[in-house]
Amino acid sequence: MAGEKTKRIACFSCLHAPITHKGYFDWLLGQIEGYKPHYIVNLGDWYEGKHAKRWAKHKSENWDALTEHRAVATQARAINQASKGAKRIWLYGNHDCNTFNPHPDRLEDDVIRALHWEENKDTSAALAHWSVVQSYGHDVYKRLGPITFAHGVDLSESGIKRETVYYSTPYGLRVSGHTHRPTELAQLDLNRALLPYYNINPGCGADWDKMPYVKRQDKQRWGRGLVLIEACGVDQSRTAYASKQWDAEVRIHSMADERF
């Protein structure tokens, strides 16, 4: 990338407000301030969306929808302050979509309209200069040049590889969240043949000790992190590239199992 104009991108996922890990969020702000990104990308599940869940609430989930709005607004203002001059993007994750988009097994449409973040003055003001992708699915993504951003749907390694090939570009990078598993930059392979596709995952930003519904899950590989990218041509739209025109790394704040 020598001699070419590059842009810096900072990307995180799964804050699950209001149960965001405070130590992680403070660390995140410091990382953003130090990196001075041109773009901020939030891969989704910004809201926990407790009131849109289909199952019984745990006694520890004792907050209301306004608490989630206040938490997101507070976080958005802090990110805005830490990333002055940056363009900011939020893609809906499954929790956000369940909360704010019509679904037959979730909230009634009139309740969604009343509780939508755009109807909350505090949240809508804090997010006024964010570009928001208000949909979610395996084929929903945001692309900045050779970098493809998505919340992600599949949790399996094979499914993540499939989504990478389907929706990113040759010699491009796919950045996704959803799994809560931070992963280093990896190049896809097929029967030991390397493919020109790459992926990376920042992990999550939630305090999983406050997630009773994941208590029985194997969280050994769960962690909190941030993906930092430097890329050429992020303001251009191309469907394929002849070579890798970016660099990326994941920085880890903490892991569920600190032996890893």
Regions found by a protein language model. Name each.
Residues 1-10, 141-148:
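Beta-strand-turn-beta hairpins that frame and shape the catalytic cleft
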Residues 8, 12, 17-125:
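Core catalytic region of metal-dependent phosphoesterases/phosphodiesterases
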Residues 22-23, 130-132, 156-159:
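Short gly/ser/thr-rich secondary-structure transition/capping motifs
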Residues 26-29, 76-77, 135-141, 159-164:
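A generic local structural motif
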Residues 87-95, 134-138, 239-245:
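Acidic carboxylate-rich catalytic motifs and surrounding loops in phosphoryl-/glycosyl-chemistry enzymes
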Residues 111-146:
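Metallo-beta-lactamase
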Residues 147-242:
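Conserved beta-sheet core of the metallophosphoesterase superfamily
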Residues 230-260:
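A short C-terminal boundary segment appended to hydrolase-like catalytic domains
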